[in-house]
Each structure stands twice: as structure tokens, then as C-alpha cells.
Amino acid sequence: KAKSQPADFEQFWNSKVSTLCEPNVLEQKEISNPASGYKGYIIKLDMGSADPAYAYLTYPQNSENGTLKAAIIYHGYGVNKISPIYVKNTVSLSVCAHSMELDGTAEYYKDMQAKLDGYGFKKVGDTENSDKEKVYFKNMLLRDLQAARYIMNNPLWNGKDLTISGGSQGAFQATAVAALCKKATELNITIPWLCDIGGETSGRINSNFRPSFTEALSYYDTVSFAAMLNKSCNVKIEAGLGDRTCPPSGVTALYNAIKAPKSILFTQNRTHE
């Protein structure tokens, strides 16, 4: 069992969701070399007064409205270029964790890496992780959710099948979005990060790569989002018994918090990979 979540956890996040503007496309650029048989675009989504969200949108050519499943993938920690995904009979989004152009120059990404170096981690003299409103992951998750809201409004979606996936930081994002969007039918996550934040204060193994515990970070615990998952969402988890970044104690707390249909595969000696 994880540390107790804040009493107003759901209220906090529901209030953030309620402030999101419509997920309108501010800019759409066609990908020059998508996979054969697919259309692909870079999309920039409106976040109102906050920085926009960016994602790759792909779907099979000549698809008719209302006929496609939907899939969303989120990515691991870092400030790196991402790639589109191509899934049969599916309209898909590959979502950038940051408000960052997807077709920038090498110099642009170098600058972004310097700007976002150590994001999410409290630095000396920095109060970011002392205030739940200022935690870097707040706007990250809201951008992630806006991408999900976009695909749920996409006319190509069949309105039924929505699979959300991710690994490590991407698993944290995927779990949060599945919890907040309420319409995910499948959640597939591997080596999920930020589970049982502060568990080390109760004697559990500490992560070797996780922000130091603060009460504000309790609002960003993957376990608490997992407890909010819709009971119609089928959850599959893969994790490693040798993972010191996402210790198995935290992943087990995540599994135990889920009230939906679920399965977990722990692999002996698997580390954070």
C-alpha cells in the first residue's frame, strides 16, 4: 500500500481539467515521409494561456469517419525528439512531454535540452516542488490530457476503443491521462515511474532517480491516479524486480490500487529497461 494520497487529490485534478479550453488545432503540418499507407501530421494544440501541446497524428489513408480505434503513446524522461507511431485500423497520437516543436533543428533541441535540464527535480533554492501548482509535471499532464481530448473528438475515432500506453515517465503520464479522461478501454504500461512517492519514509526502497519527496509531489503519484481508473479500463503492467528507478514495491502499490481488470508481469533481474 502506498502513502495516503491528499484528501483533495481528485478535487485538485478535476478542477484543473475543468479549466482546459477546447482542444483546437492551432497548426497542422503534414509529415513528408509517413509509413506506407498512412497519413501523418504534426499537430499543435491550444492550451489557452499555457504553452501549447505537440503530437504526431497518424492514421490509415482513406479511413472513413467513425471507423478507427484510437491509441495514444507517451514517452520516457528526457528532452528528445519523438517519433510517430503507426497502428493498423487506428488513429494514433505520439505525444511530446514538453511544449516543444517536433521538427526543429539540432540547435533548437540543444537549446531546449539546456533549458529543461533536470526538469521536475527540485534544485537548490528552487521552490517548484514545494507548491503543487508549480510542479513541472502539472502542465505536462494537462498537455497530455489535451491530446487525449483531441483524439476523443477526432471524427475518425469509433467512440469505443481507446488504448493508452507508455513506459517509465510515459507510464506515469499514460496512467494519469487514463484516469482523467475516463474513456480509456486499455492501459498498457511498463516500468511505471513516480509510484509511491515518499515510500522511502515508510522503510521501502527509494528510487535512484526520482525527485525528493514533498507534500506537493503527492499530487503527482502514479498510484493515486491508478486508483481513479474507470472500472471498464483493462490494465496491463510490466515491471522489473531489479529496477531501482521504479522499485517493485511502488509498482506493487500501483497494482493494488487499481480497481479495474488488471494483470502484472514482474521479470526477475529486469532493471529499468
Kindly give the residue locations of the regions a language model identified.
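Cap/lid segment of the alpha/beta-hydrolase catalytic domain
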Residues: 82-87, 91-142, 199-201
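Glycine-rich His-Gly loop
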Residues: 47, 73-78, 97, 240
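Short beta-strand element of the alpha/beta-hydrolase
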Residues: 54-59, 66-78
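Histidine-bearing beta->alpha loop at or near hydrolase active sites
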Residues: 261-273
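N-terminal targeting or regulatory segments adjacent to alpha/beta-hydrolase or S9 domains
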Residues: 1-39
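Primarily recognizes the serine-hydrolase "nucleophile elbow" in alpha/beta-hydrolase
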Residues: 145-208
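The feature captures the conserved acid-bearing segment of alpha/beta-hydrolase catalytic domains
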Residues: 198-258
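A short, hydrophobic beta-strand element of the alpha/beta-hydrolase
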Residues: 73, 94, 187-190
